[in-house]
Structure formats: structure tokens, C-alpha cells
Amino acid sequence: MAGIPDHIQDQHLVEEDQPFDLEDWLPITASRNANWYYSAFHNVTAIVGAGVLGLPYAMSELGWGPGVVVLILSWVITLYTLWQMIEMHEMFEGQRFDRYHELGQAAFGKKLGLYIIVPLQLLVEISVCIVYMVTGGKSLKNVHDLALGDGDKCTKLRIQHFILIFASSQFVLSLLKNFNSISGVSLVAAVMSVSYSTIAWVASLRKGATTGSVEYGYRKRTTSVPLAFLSALGEMAFAYAGHNVVLEIQATIPSTPENPSKRPMWKGAVVAYIIVAFCYFPVALVGFKTFGNSVEESILESLTKPTALVIVANMFVVIHLLGSYQVYAMPVFDMIESVMIRIWHFSPTRVLRFTIRWTFVAATMGIAVGLPYYSALLSFFGGFVFAPTTYFIPCIMWLILKKPKRFSLSWCMNWFCIIFGLVLMIIAPIGGLAKLIYNIQKGTLPNSRCNLPKH
């Protein structure tokens, strides 16, 4: 291994006179006893989330040709950049980059690395938590509407009420102290993600046998066809968000010179990506083939029969998002707790920890209640912040730290990913922002199977 560059030596999170080791208290590095299957289910939980349910809708906005190309290309590129980050986790002897921003400091410099990575990573993790609040609320509402059906049984409960119900569980789960303490929750969440994805495409396939003519051409929705196309690119990008927590997951795995953490981490990541492919490709392709351009923003909203199975699928989504929210919230807790103790000199107490975490849950809940627009949030955040942290920043750091030979295969692959990611970051948020503005102006709330009175 290479020596540690001068600009990243002695990067301590704790002041020299600190009477304890902060790393042993922070949620990311407090426990290092994970293994490859921890890596597998943490990555499945992190990657397979709200994005998979919106893939058929994204396909309807892109069309068969572009949709399949973007779907496959995104899977390949993000697997490659995930491998890069795993390799760079401990590329210098005696140094582990346990957090995304620490690797950014190694590549861009101590200050510039923070300025580049921290805002983007925070935006990703906060936006994921907001979208998961919305998706959890939507799924609970679907369960409610399917169970009661149309007519007099319908209540006046709106999606905002169900977001509040979903958020109440997060106040409890946020009390789990570190990454390894949420392993059980994450494992259940990973199983749930595979389960509801399977139900979604199998139920769609079953419905397809009885469906009449289906149209696959572009259809104007809330925005023009070109803007919808751009929006769909962001929705595709949102489906691959695991890079923002991959180093934090790897930090929980022990490492020795004989058995570096990258081996079990990569093994788990490969297993996770095989599972991701099993979830994403059937849902996207079968869902679009069955419903065409009439598919709803979430594939589960297009499915009504068999009612009991669709209700179960929606509950699986809720259970999965309970764990997935925590996987993305934990690095945010880690950052805030570190700053509060190291810079503002707060004592590391349970009161501090609970206050930080409950404030964060309440903030994401409030934003979700105010902006419950699933597809628009997916496309805007997917392009604006997911494209940089997932598609091209890992490649830029690889070029800086690994320095591959110019015009070599590695050099060319990285520049292709950088250009692809930059284009995605520039054009995708345009469609998402247009859709978000339209929904806010019209006051459009997600569809309901119950005919609720308008106020």
C-alpha cells in the first residue's frame, strides 16, 4: 500500500485533550464486528427502496429503448463506482476512510474535500429520508384504501396523516445507538424489499394475462414529454443511492493486513447487486409491459388485485422503509454528533443523542408532510445530488488517488462515467423541478382509491 498523503495525516475528530475516544462513541465506528453478509443486507436495504417502485413509471416516460439502456447502464456504472469506493476505503497503509467525506479529503484536500462532499452527502441522506417518509405514508394510505374500498367506508384521512403515523415509528428506531445495533432491523428490511419487489412483478405478470390493449407511446402527464423524459432520468438515478453509505457500512467490518475489509465488503456488495438486479429489472420491465404509459407513479398503486396480496406488499414496503430510513439517517447522526462534541464541546450524553435524532426525524417528517410528491422528489433529488455522489465523484477521486495511465481502459471508463454523471446532474433536475412546481401550484396530492371530498 502507498504511504498516507501529507494533507490527510493526523485528521483527528477529537481534540488532543479529549478524555475519551470519540470514534468509540460515534454511531459509525463504535462497533467493528460485521462481516460480508452484514454488508450484503445493509447494501440491499440502502439501495432497494422507494426508487424501485417508481421504475415502471420512469420507463413509461423514457420509452422502451432509452428506458432499457438507462436501466442497464445505471446498474453497470454504479456497480463499478461502488467497487471503486470499496477499494479506496483503506488504500493507504494504516488509514481507513470510514466516511465519504474522509475519502473526499484524501482526494481533494482537507478543507475542499469537506466543502465538496459533506453538503452533497447530507443532501442525499436527508432527501432519501424525506422521500422514505412520503413513500411510507403512501404505502400506509394504500393499505387503508384497499382495506376499506370505495364508498361510505372511506375516511377523510389524507396522505399527510399517514406520514405522521409512519414517522412515529422512526422516533423509536432512531434511539438505536450505532450501525451494528440496527443490523436486525436492516436484515428484516432487506427481506421485505425482495418480498414486495417480487409481489409487484409477479402480480403485474398475472394481471398482464388478462389486460387488453396497452399503449407504450409517450403521453403528456403533468409536464411536457421532453420534461417528463428528463424527470425519468432523475428517477432512475434515485434508484442507486447506496454509495452514500457504503464507506460507513464498510467501517463496521474489522480489517487486518491479512484480511482487509474490502474482501468481505466486496463479496457482500456483489451479492447485494445480484439481489438488486432481481428486484429492479423484473419490476421495471414487467410493470411497464403490463400497464404501459398508464402506470401510476408507484407500481403498487396500479395493482388492486388480489387485494390481500397487494395489501401485504404495501406493508412490506412500510417495514422495509422503517429500516432503510435508519441506514441513511445514521451517517447524519454521526456527523451532527461529531460536530456537537468536537467543535461545540457538548458532553456525549444520551440526552444529546436523543435530542439530535428526534429533531432530525421531526424535520424530515415536517418537510414530507409539506411536500408529499413522490415522483417529483425522486426525479429532482435523483439528478441534483445522487448523480454526483454515485456516478462521477467516485471516478474523480479514483483518477486523483490511483492515477491510472492516460487513455488506459481505467482512465477511459472513469471519464465516460464522469461525463454520463455530469449530463445526468445537469438535465435530470430540470424535469423534476418542473413536476414539483406543477404539483405545488395545482395542489395535486397523490391519487386515492377512495373518493374523498375536496376541501
Curated annotation (Swiss-Prot):
<feature type="transmembrane region" description="Helical">
    <location>
        <begin position="358"/>
        <end position="378"/>
    </location>
</feature>
<feature type="topological domain" description="Cytoplasmic">
    <location>
        <begin position="329"/>
        <end position="357"/>
    </location>
</feature>
<keyword id="KW-0812">Transmembrane</keyword>
<feature type="transmembrane region" description="Helical">
    <location>
        <begin position="159"/>
        <end position="179"/>
    </location>
</feature>
<feature type="transmembrane region" description="Helical">
    <location>
        <begin position="227"/>
        <end position="247"/>
    </location>
</feature>
<feature type="topological domain" description="Extracellular">
    <location>
        <begin position="289"/>
        <end position="307"/>
    </location>
</feature>
<keyword id="KW-1133">Transmembrane helix</keyword>
<feature type="transmembrane region" description="Helical">
    <location>
        <begin position="62"/>
        <end position="82"/>
    </location>
</feature>
<comment type="function">
    <text>Amino acid transporter.</text>
</comment>
<dbReference type="GO" id="GO:0015183">
    <property type="term" value="F:L-aspartate transmembrane transporter activity"/>
</dbReference>
<feature type="topological domain" description="Extracellular">
    <location>
        <begin position="203"/>
        <end position="226"/>
    </location>
</feature>
<feature type="transmembrane region" description="Helical">
    <location>
        <begin position="308"/>
        <end position="328"/>
    </location>
</feature>
<feature type="topological domain" description="Cytoplasmic">
    <location>
        <begin position="180"/>
        <end position="181"/>
    </location>
</feature>
<feature type="topological domain" description="Cytoplasmic">
    <location>
        <begin position="248"/>
        <end position="267"/>
    </location>
</feature>
<feature type="transmembrane region" description="Helical">
    <location>
        <begin position="380"/>
        <end position="400"/>
    </location>
</feature>
<feature type="topological domain" description="Extracellular">
    <location>
        <begin position="60"/>
        <end position="61"/>
    </location>
</feature>
<dbReference type="GO" id="GO:0098712">
    <property type="term" value="P:L-glutamate import across plasma membrane"/>
</dbReference>
<dbReference type="GO" id="GO:0005886">
    <property type="term" value="C:plasma membrane"/>
</dbReference>
<comment type="similarity">
    <text>Belongs to the amino acid/polyamine transporter 2 family. Amino acid/auxin permease (AAAP) (TC 2.A.18.2) subfamily.</text>
</comment>
<dbReference type="GO" id="GO:0005313">
    <property type="term" value="F:L-glutamate transmembrane transporter activity"/>
</dbReference>
<feature type="transmembrane region" description="Helical">
    <location>
        <begin position="114"/>
        <end position="134"/>
    </location>
</feature>
<feature type="transmembrane region" description="Helical">
    <location>
        <begin position="182"/>
        <end position="202"/>
    </location>
</feature>
<dbReference type="GO" id="GO:0015808">
    <property type="term" value="P:L-alanine transport"/>
</dbReference>
<feature type="topological domain" description="Cytoplasmic">
    <location>
        <begin position="401"/>
        <end position="412"/>
    </location>
</feature>
<dbReference type="GO" id="GO:0070778">
    <property type="term" value="P:L-aspartate transmembrane transport"/>
</dbReference>
<feature type="transmembrane region" description="Helical">
    <location>
        <begin position="413"/>
        <end position="433"/>
    </location>
</feature>
<keyword id="KW-0813">Transport</keyword>
<protein>
    <recommendedName>
        <fullName>Lysine histidine transporter-like 4</fullName>
    </recommendedName>
</protein>
<keyword id="KW-1003">Cell membrane</keyword>
<feature type="topological domain" description="Extracellular">
    <location>
        <begin position="434"/>
        <end position="455"/>
    </location>
</feature>
<dbReference type="GO" id="GO:0015180">
    <property type="term" value="F:L-alanine transmembrane transporter activity"/>
</dbReference>
<dbReference type="Pfam" id="PF01490">
    <property type="entry name" value="Aa_trans"/>
</dbReference>
<feature type="topological domain" description="Extracellular">
    <location>
        <begin position="135"/>
        <end position="158"/>
    </location>
</feature>
<feature type="topological domain" description="Cytoplasmic">
    <location>
        <begin position="1"/>
        <end position="38"/>
    </location>
</feature>
<feature type="topological domain" description="Cytoplasmic">
    <location>
        <begin position="83"/>
        <end position="113"/>
    </location>
</feature>
<feature type="transmembrane region" description="Helical">
    <location>
        <begin position="268"/>
        <end position="288"/>
    </location>
</feature>
<keyword id="KW-0472">Membrane</keyword>
<feature type="transmembrane region" description="Helical">
    <location>
        <begin position="39"/>
        <end position="59"/>
    </location>
</feature>
<feature type="topological domain" description="Extracellular">
    <location>
        <position position="379"/>
    </location>
</feature>
<keyword id="KW-0029">Amino-acid transport</keyword>
<dbReference type="InterPro" id="IPR013057">
    <property type="entry name" value="AA_transpt_TM"/>
</dbReference>
